[in-house]
């Protein structure tokens, strides 16, 4: 990921540090994540709702072999944390072994996430959330199906002058990572409008923390 440092630094200078990495995992592993996600027993899912938004979440990955391996052997590994630190310049990054708010997520057809900013304090870890990573895993996703991750320079629901900084399509095996700041970045997800036979916009999320 060190080759993404220039992109990260450029976006940071503009006030919105983030990068997009395509073909992040090998195709087979990413497909296994998708199959595991859509076949996970319904009883373990929670539903997040707010102001017309709706997202399904599943973070008990201990019984899911592919997600467990990818999370703890790759995304939480010392090697990956070292790469993140080199790319972002943020030292002392720590993963969350409890996956508070992380893990699988699904946005089904017709759903959105309205503009908001994420929590940046993990009360269980007593740490500040610094980075958010999202890996999109629905195969053959098309840009016109929506579900884009939209970054704003303000909250359009509170500020009529707020504008879109970037809109990123949730293409299969695309990984995006962005820096969390106090009350930011404001982001949303555009309406998911996939065909009826597509399960939805599926992803797996990873959060990273610092002590100060």
Set out the residue ranges of the language-model regions:
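Short, well-ordered beta-to-alpha junction loops that form the rim of enzyme active sites
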Residues: 23-24, 100, 117, 181
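A structural signal for short, well-ordered beta-strand segments and their strand-loop junctions
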Residues: 20-21, 46-47, 94-99, 103, ...
């Amino acid at each position: 990921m060190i080759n993404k440092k220039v992109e990260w630094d450029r976006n940071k200078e503009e006030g919105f540090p983030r990068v997009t990495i395509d073909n992040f995992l090998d195709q087979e592993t990413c497909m296994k994540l998708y199959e595991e996600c859509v076949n996970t027993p319904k009883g373990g899912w929670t539903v997040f709702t707010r102001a017309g938004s709706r997202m399904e979440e599943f973070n008990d990955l201990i019984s899911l072999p592919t997600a467990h391996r990818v999370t703890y052997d790759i995304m939480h590994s010392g090697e990956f944390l070292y790469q993140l630190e080199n790319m972002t310049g943020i030292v002392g990054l720590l993963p969350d072994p409890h996956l508070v708010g992380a893990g699988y997520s699904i946005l089904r057809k017709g759903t959105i996430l309205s503009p908001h900013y994420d929590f940046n304090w993990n009360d269980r870890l007593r740490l500040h959330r610094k980075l958010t990573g999202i890996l999109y895993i629905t195969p053959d996703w098309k840009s016109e199906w929506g579900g884009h991750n939209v970054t704003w320079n303000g909250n359009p629901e509170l500020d009529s002058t707020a504008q879109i900084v970037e809109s990123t399509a949730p293409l299969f095996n695309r990984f995006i990572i962005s820096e969390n700041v106090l009350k930011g970045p404001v982001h949303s997800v555009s309406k998911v409008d996939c065909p009826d036979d597509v399960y939805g916009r599926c992803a797996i999320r990873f959060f990273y923390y610092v002590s100060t």
